[in-house]
């Protein structure tokens, strides 16, 4: 991999492109086994999960209906405590199997509130697939993670969709941002 100025802002790489793609293929095999006859609605939580979602879909061997949602319970880096949906689903999920695809579960607040919102729409089933689960000890919100790519340490993660002030998303690796960049 060619070094770029953005790579200089990494303390270290946690997962390279090969690691990420290998784990995505493994997750896709698990998902295919479960969903092969269910025609689920697969919801991408934008913007961070778009890289993971796109690569994951390429390896799934079953019929599905893609959809997208933009939501947050944060303003900047501060939690508002309330879920704001700025782009809702186009698909009616009542009676459908639903898989929410997320980039990372941190405290669990946003996902907890999103799952509560989606559950009110009466899906047949509701599951979560996240690329990363941040190891922060006991999470503030109990979120069931049905499929997880990696457990990452409690540091500022960037690359492959993860951002810092909307930068670094396009790094092809997952890494830890140097503390000097954000302090």
Curated annotation (Swiss-Prot):
User: Which pathway does the protein contribute to?
Assistant: Purine metabolism; GMP biosynthesis via salvage pathway; GMP from guanine: step 1/1; Purine metabolism; IMP biosynthesis via salvage pathway; IMP from hypoxanthine: step 1/1; Purine metabolism; XMP biosynthesis via salvage pathway; XMP from xanthine: step 1/1
Task: Keyword check for Transferase, yes or no.
Answer: yes
Q: Which SUPFAM superfamilies match?
A: PRTase-like
Q: Name one GO molecular function term.
A: hypoxanthine phosphoribosyltransferase activity
May I have one GO cellular component term?
Answer: cytosol
Q: Where in the cell is it found?
A: Cytoplasm
Pfam families annotated for this entry? Pribosyltran
> Which cofactors is this protein said to need?
Mg(2+)
Documented EC number(s): 2.4.2.22, 2.4.2.8
**Single Gene Ontology BP annotation:** XMP salvage
Q: Which residues bind GMP?
A: 102-110, 134, 163
Task: Outline the subunit composition.
Answer: Homodimer.
What protein is this chain from? Hypoxanthine-guanine-xanthine phosphoribosyltransferase
Identify the gene encoding this protein. Answer: HPT
């Amino acid at each position: 991999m060619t070094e770029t100025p953005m790579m200089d802002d990494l303390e270290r790489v946690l997962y390279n492109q090969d690691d990420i793609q290998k784990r995505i293929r493994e997750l896709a095999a698990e998902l295919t086994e479960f969903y092969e006859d269910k025609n689920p609605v697969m919801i991408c939580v934008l913007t961070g999960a778009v890289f993971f979602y796109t690569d994951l879909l390429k390896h799934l061997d079953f019929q599905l209906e893609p959809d997208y949602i933009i939501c947050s319970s944060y303003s900047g880096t501060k939690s508002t405590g309330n879920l704001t949906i700025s782009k809702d689903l186009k698909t009616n999920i009542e009676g459908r199997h639903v898989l929410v695809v997320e980039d990372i579960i941190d405290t669990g607040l946003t996902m907890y509130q999103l799952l509560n919102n989606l559950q009110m729409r009466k899906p047949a089933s509701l599951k979560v697939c996240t690329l990363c689960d941040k190891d922060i000890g006991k999470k503030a919100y109990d979120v069931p993670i049905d499929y997880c790519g990696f457990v990452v340490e409690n540091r500022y993660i960037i690359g492959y969709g993860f951002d810092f002030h909307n930068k670094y998303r396009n790094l092809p690796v997952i890494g830890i941002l140097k503390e000097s960049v954000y302090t």
